[in-house]
Amino acid sequence: MSDEEHQFESKADAGASKTYPQQAGTIRKGGHIVIKNRACKVVEVSTSKTGKHGHAKCHFVAIDIFNGKKLEDIVPSSHNCDVPHVNRTDYQLIDISEDGFVSLLTENGNTKDDLKLPTDDALLTQIKDGFGEGKDLVVSVMSAMGEEQICALKDIGPK
């Protein structure tokens, strides 16, 4: 062992799994599920009874949390589904670049410059207008399965 100090910056999730297994029958409305390799929020769950051939089935209707598309899946209720690790983090908005990227201030005082403005028109307008008026804005960033996107905005007053 050397006496040198080893420092590294953790930029990723250190190889942790992006999902965890959960039995289909225990996933509820408002929960999350992975359908077609996309992180989704469950908006409707219906179960069918055990039939002549096999298991009771769960029918999931879910909305992709990043692009808003509706996805559906049918899974036997005893089988495991992938559930994404979904995190929300608040950052203070520092700047908006001309190419559509935002500069955000993290809790430890560093800047995060790798996020684009959201594609949701209403949210995009709120952010641009609020920033143009010189308000202090805090954006909520949702991250799941290696994707990140601004999903909400809070006004914490004038600068």
From Swiss-Prot:
Where Hypusine occurs, residue numbers? K52
Q: What is this protein called?
A: Eukaryotic translation initiation factor 5A
GO biological process: what's one of them? positive regulation of translational termination
PTMs per UniProt: Lys-52 undergoes hypusination, a unique post-translational modification that consists in the addition of a butylamino group from spermidine to lysine side chain, leading to the formation of the unusual amino acid hypusine. eIF-5As are the only known proteins to undergo this modification, which is essential for their function.
Keyword S-adenosyl-L-methionine among record annotations: no
A Gene Ontology molecular function term for this protein is:
RNA binding
- Determine the domain of life of the protein's source: Eukaryota
